[in-house]
C-alpha cells in the first residue's frame, strides 16, 4: 500500500521555507531546538482561538524574533497591545533571551490549510454534518482562486460504530510535482464519539524560479518558406 510523504518536508529548500531560520554551534543546537518547540507549544495553547496559521522563529544575535501569522491579529495584539506584551515577556522567559513578537495578517484564510482544517474541526465539534463542512471549505477555496483542494476526514463519522475515512477533492492536487506550491495541514475534532482527524491539501499553483508560474503562451512557429511550383523542365 502506497504511503504519502509530508508535502512540506519533501519541498523544503525547493519551494517551501523552514519554519525556524537560525544557525547554532553544536553545543547550542539542542537548546535552541528545544526552545523553539516550547515557544510554539506555548503560543499555540495561548492563541487557540486566534486563528494562528503558523509561527516562524529567527534568532539574531542572542535574541529571539517570533512572527505569528494569524487571520485575527486584533485578538493577538489585544487592547493597546497589552496581550502581545504579555506574550513577549513569556516567550523571553521560556527562551532565556530577549524576545521580539511580530504579527503578520493572513489575508485569505480560506486558502490556508491550517485555518481550513481548524474551521472544519470546529464545525464537526458543533455537530455540523461532515460532508457539508467539507464541501463548504472546498467551495470557498476554489472561489478564492485555489487551483485544487483535497479534504479528508477520518474517524467515527456521524457516530458510526466503525471508523472510516472519506475525502472530497476539486481541481488538481499534484503531490509528486516538487515545484507545485501545496499547503498541507491537519487538525483534530474532539467529539462525543471520539477524535476525528482532518487533513487538508491546497494547491495554489506552480513556482518557477521563486515566482508563481504564469501560463505560457505557445510560441508561434515561423511559417515554412513557400515552395516554387514545379515546372515542366528548364527552358
Swiss-Prot record:
PROSITE patterns: KH_TYPE_2, RIBOSOMAL_S3
Keywords: Ribonucleoprotein, Ribosomal protein, RNA-binding, rRNA-binding
SMART domains registered for this protein in UniProt: KH
Chloroplast keyword on record: no
SUPFAM superfamilies: Prokaryotic type KH domain (KH-domain type II), Ribosomal protein S3 C-terminal domain
Disulphide linkage map: none
Superkingdom of the organism of origin: Bacteria
UniProt GO MF annotations: mRNA binding; rRNA binding; structural constituent of ribosome
Any one annotated GO CC term: cytosolic small ribosomal subunit
GO annotation, biological process: translation
Domain KH type-2: 39-107
Matches recorded under HAMAP family: Ribosomal_uS3_B
Record's function text: Binds the lower part of the 30S subunit head. Binds mRNA in the 70S ribosome, positioning it for translation.
Family: Belongs to the universal ribosomal protein uS3 family.
Assembly and interaction partners: Part of the 30S ribosomal subunit. Forms a tight complex with proteins S10 and S14.
Official protein name in the record: Small ribosomal subunit protein uS3
Organism of derivation: Actinobacillus succinogenes (strain ATCC 55618 / DSM 22257 / CCUG 43843 / 130Z)
Gene: rpsC
Amino acid at each position: 500500500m502506497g504511503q504519502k510523504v509530508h508535502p512540506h518536508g519533501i519541498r523544503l529548500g525547493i519551494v517551501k521555507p523552514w519554519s525556524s531560520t537560525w544557525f547554532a554551534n553544536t553545543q547550542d543546537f539542542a537548546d535552541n531546538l528545544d526552545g523553539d518547540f516550547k515557544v510554539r507549544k506555548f503560543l499555540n495553547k495561548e492563541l487557540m482561538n486566534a486563528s494562528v496559521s503558523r509561527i516562524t522563529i529567527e534568532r539574531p544575535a542572542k535574541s529571539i524574533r517570533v512572527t505569528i501569522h494569524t487571520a485575527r491579529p486584533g485578538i493577538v495584539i489585544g487592547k493597546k497591545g497589552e496581550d502581545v506584551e504579555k506574550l513577549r515577556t513569556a516567550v523571553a522567559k521560556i527562551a532565556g533571551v530577549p524576545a521580539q513578537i511580530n504579527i503578520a495578517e493572513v489575508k485569505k484564510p480560506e486558502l490556508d490549510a491550517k485555518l481550513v482544517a481548524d474551521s472544519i474541526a470546529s464545525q464537526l465539534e458543533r455537530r455540523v454534518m461532515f460532508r457539508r463542512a467539507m464541501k463548504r471549505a472546498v467551495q470557498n477555496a476554489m472561489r478564492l482562486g485555489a487551483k485544487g483542494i483535497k479534504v479528508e476526514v477520518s474517524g467515527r463519522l456521524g457516530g458510526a460504530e466503525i471508523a472510516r475515512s472519506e475525502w472530497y477533492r476539486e481541481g488538481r492536487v499534484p503531490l509528486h510535482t516538487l515545484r507545485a506550491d501545496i499547503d498541507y495541514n491537519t487538525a483534530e475534532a474532539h467529539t462525543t464519539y471520539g477524535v476525528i482527524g482532518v487533513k487538508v491539501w491546497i494547491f495554489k499553483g506552480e513556482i518557477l524560479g521563486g515566482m508563481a508560474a504564469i501560463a505560457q503562451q505557445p510560441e508561434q512557429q515561423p511559417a515554412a518558406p513557400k515552395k516554387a511550383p514545379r515546372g515542366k523542365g528548364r527552358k
